[in-house]
């Protein structure tokens, strides 16, 4: 898995993003795995405030659900996040599913905690919870700025 994570990190750097930051423990259930895979994934999801595992890249999502997650983050003005393309690495793709005990991709983590996939992020966007969660991370949603402009 170490080589897999190296490829994922290299892909992340190719996207022009440097990883940094910290986080709280993830809420997902971890499956026992060999070679410290869970520990390596734990480090990945905690490395940045917002981490997304998707099919493709933010610039070129390869499935509608991954595209929806990217678009929701863009609507909120979230541009600084770590994105890992699971299509580049089958071990990473299966490993993150085992790590979170969630069967599908994309997967979104906020401050090291597993949030869910596209459907949950969309629901959080629609009911306003995403604005609040981003605020807890010190990220001001662009939608709040837009509302402020409209009220003036």
Curated annotation (Swiss-Prot):
Q: What Gene Ontology terms for biological process does this UniProt record contain?
A: [2Fe-2S] cluster assembly; hemopoiesis; protein maturation
The regions listed as transmembrane in this protein's record are none
PTM N6-succinyllysine: list the residues: 55
Question: Which residues belong to any copy of the Glutaredoxin domain?
Answer: 38-141
Record's keyword terms, sorted: 2Fe-2S, Iron, Iron-sulfur, Metal-binding, Mitochondrion, Phosphoprotein, Redox-active center, Transit peptide
Name of one Pfam family that matches: Glutaredoxin
Q: Which domain of life is it from?
A: Eukaryota
Q: Tell me the residues of the organelle transit peptide.
A: 1-31
Listed binding positions for [2Fe-2S] cluster are 63
| Tissue expression summary | Detected in bone, liver, muscle and kidney.
According to the UniProt record, list the residues that bear Phosphoserine.
Answer: 151
Q: Where does glutathione bind?
A: 55, 93-97, 105, 118-119
Task: Write down the SUPFAM superfamilies for this protein, in alphabetical order.
Answer: Thioredoxin-like (SSF52833)
GO CC annotations? iron-sulfur cluster assembly complex; mitochondrial matrix; mitochondrion
Recorded GO molecular functions are: 2 iron, 2 sulfur cluster binding; metal ion binding
Compartments, as annotated in UniProt: Mitochondrion matrix
Q: Does the keyword Zinc apply?
A: no
Instruction: State the protein's purpose.
Output: Monothiol glutaredoxin involved in mitochondrial iron-sulfur (Fe/S) cluster transfer. Receives 2Fe/2S clusters from scaffold protein ISCU and mediates their transfer to apoproteins, to the 4Fe/FS cluster biosynthesis machinery, or export from mitochondrion. Required for normal regulation of hemoglobin synthesis by the iron-sulfur protein ACO1.
Record text on subunit structure and interactions:
Homodimer. Interacts with ISCU. Interacts with BOLA1.
- Give the family from UniProt: Belongs to the glutaredoxin family. Monothiol subfamily.
Protein name, as recorded = Glutaredoxin-related protein 5, mitochondrial
Which organism is this entry from? Mus musculus
| Species lineage | Eukaryota, Metazoa, Chordata, Craniata, Vertebrata
Name of the gene this protein is made from: Glrx5
